[in-house]
Amino acid sequence: MTKRLTPQEKLSRKPASRACTFCHQKHLQCSNERPCKNCVKRNIADQCQDITRKRVKYLTGANSKAVAAATTPEATTTTPKRKQKRSVKGSPSISFPSSSISPINTSTFDTNGHPNGHPNDLLRQSLEASQAGQAQAPSLLEIQGPFPQMQTLQPTHTVASETSSSYSQVQPQHHPESSVPPSAPPESVDQLQQLMMHDSAYFNTNNVALNPTNVLEADPFDGHTNTMLNTTTDVLNKLLNDHYEIDNILQPPDDALLVDQQQSSSEATGTSASKAVPMGPSHSNTHFSSNYLNEEYLMLGDILLQSKPTSPSPSNTSASEYNMLSPSYTQNIDFDNIHLSKRKVVQKLKDSRPFISLGFPKDSSLSLDNLNNMAHQTDNLLDNNVSSRGNNNTSNQKLQSAIASKTSKTNPIINFATKYSTEYVSPLSTHQIYQTVSDIYSKDVLNYEYPNSYHALTHFLKTRFSGNNLPHEEKARKRQNLLVILKLIASYRPTFISAHKSLLKPQDLLFLEMSFQRCLIDYEKLSQLNSSPTIIWRRTGEIVSITDDLLSLLGYKLLDILSKRTFIMEIMYDDESIVKYFQLFKSVAVGNLHSSINTKVKLIKNGGAVPGGGTSNGKYNYNNNYNHNYSHNNNNNNNSNNSNNNGMSTGAGNSGDGDGLENNVGTNSYIEFCSVWTVKRDLFDIPMLIIGQFLPILPAGDGVRMY
């Protein structure tokens, strides 16, 4: 009985890389030294040898298994009877003693020693002779004379293994348990078929001479064990050895004759030629026997050869670390013809199966001339003529006539006369141009200049936080807030710039603007179905859409907001709301892909006073073209009328009559909202537009429940 090990011995012992034959059969813990401890303890140290590992089925053929089983001495000397019966079916190794060989008629063989008759004809003759009661075996079994090496029916060509240092020599061996008496007839038809299969295998493989040129090389995957973990390793090894496949593409292999002989021998022995994998470098065309591994190999080849990082996100900065090749592989690369090799491999992958190429081909047929046809085709396909914006009664007739004269339905998507135009187009104008989805594809697309928008934003921030006519302490505090905001903008804007540097100008920029207008139409339809007041603005902060109920709450008109460049920060009441906005936007601008923000914000009413001086009407007078002055009393009356028309709750104010109606929501200067911001990103994962929904916080009083 095996001695029980102590816990200390179990921790100190190390597993062996390969067990010996005895330990493998007895399921014992083997050691690395030879002879191992178990064999020394049992006095069988002379028989301690490494076990021959079982090879993976899809890396070797049935013919090579038969050769290995026939040339291994242990297969006929030390194996049990049960394993010998199993080896008879897969790898025949039956031999005859010299005393059982009788003269043979040489007329049945040609000059090269091959039988003239077909094995099936010989088998038919043997069956007829056995049925007639003849006492002798068929003439094919009576072998002597010019074939002395046929006394052992073993193939003469061998396969080089890991441990062999010289070519193996075939020696005649006698096995009494498998020999057949010379005068005994075959007992059954199965025995005759087995004997004939042995003889045909010998005659098909005997014509290969035993010399170094005909000895096959070792398979490069011979060291792998039969585990599922090695499938990925095999795929990567094949990817790193693509220069063998390039050689096979350029010229046929030198050992084509040897492969044909092996295939013919495998067909004669009854094995399927489709399952036999040729050994050596010429096996690259038959990748794997598994369709899953073939697909994995082809997909890895596509990724390694044609993929490239296209996003400036931090996750792609370390992609080059995984694309490095080992030094052993670079030694085998021909740097003179390296581009030719890559083209050969790519062409081989294209010929292997149809796939979608990762990246843009150099000979792309997509030109600017085809974009006109694409515009007409898209105009026919998109029949969404329902406008989500409608005609505004507040817009001027002159503005509509100017827009109608500037754009027409027959213009292409890209107008080369205006593609480099930097003229600013207000959101109200774009609402009149793109009223339906079909208008985006049929009318001229105007490019949006983000740098000019950032310059206007910087000018507004400097004006807002200038702190004129304020004490020194208040002015220093405003300047500190301005520095915080500028640092936040500088943290994410370089990423936006780097993402746009790789674009094809102006086509990609126009495509991004088309995507923006397409999403804007959908979100405006959604805001009409939603009861909450909504504002939609770009990533620069410029407002592009606002609902009527929010306009009525704040006392603005649509022309006041959308007829010029108006930022969301302009209608924020205090400096803390502006600083908090940039902090929240910086958190979702780069890296973090969260799409919603919950916060509180104070929005200025029309005509309300801003802390630190100034009013909301003039926006600090930084844009004098659209400076609208309204009196405070008129604003209050407009607020009350708009609130009554939209069904909002209003208060009677201090006086009980209807002369001085005021908006009872918020204060006279601002309204505090609970807001939810939804971030919509473009194809670079950069915020494209932000949808803000604002719910006013009602004041506490009689009839108002507080939570």
Curated annotation (Swiss-Prot):
Keyword Metal-binding: yes
Any Pfam family matching the protein: Zn_clus
Region span, Disordered: 63-122, 154-188, 260-283, 385-404, 621-659
Ranges where the PAS domain occurs: 522-591
Skewed-composition ranges (Low complexity): 66-79, 91-104, 178-188, 621-652
Location(s) in or outside the cell: Nucleus
Keywords: DNA-binding, Metal-binding, Nucleus, Transcription, Transcription regulation, Zinc
Biased composition (Polar residues): 105-114, 154-172, 260-274
GO MF, any single term: DNA-binding transcription factor activity, RNA polymerase II-specific
Gene3D superfamilies reported for this sequence: Zn(2)-C6 fungal-type DNA-binding domain
GO cellular component, one term: nucleus
PROSITE patterns, per database record: ZN2_CY6_FUNGAL_1, ZN2_CY6_FUNGAL_2
DNA-binding region(s) from the entry: 20-48
GO BP annotation list: cellular response to starvation
CDD domains referenced in this protein's UniProt entry, alphabetically: GAL4
Statement: the UniProt record of this protein carries the keyword Electron transport: no
Family the entry assigns: Belongs to the ERT1/acuK family.
Job description of the protein: Transcription factor which regulates nonfermentable carbon utilization.
Protein name: Glucose starvation modulator protein 1
Species of provenance: Lodderomyces elongisporus (strain ATCC 11503 / CBS 2605 / JCM 1781 / NBRC 1676 / NRRL YB-4239) (Yeast)
